[in-house]
């Protein structure tokens, strides 16, 4: 899980979703998991 100021989709499997006001990226590739904070 990377914590970043700006989250971007890295590959085509990445999905940007918002959970409880937190922007997250979920992906089948574990390295691509990110959240904004």
UniProtKB/Swiss-Prot annotation:
Keyword match Ribonucleoprotein: yes
Keywords of this entry: Ribonucleoprotein, Ribosomal protein
Record GO terms (molecular function): structural constituent of ribosome
A Gene Ontology term for the protein's cellular component: ribonucleoprotein complex
Cross-referenced InterPro entries: Ribosomal_bL36, Ribosomal_bL36_sp
Pfam families for this protein: Ribosomal_L36
Highest taxon of the lineage: Bacteria
S-S bonds: none
Keyword match Ribosomal protein: yes
UniProt-listed GO biological process terms: translation
Protein family membership: Belongs to the bacterial ribosomal protein bL36 family.
Protein name: Large ribosomal subunit protein bL36B
Biological classification of the source: Bacteria, Pseudomonadati, Pseudomonadota, Gammaproteobacteria, Aeromonadales
Gene assigned in the entry: rpmJ2
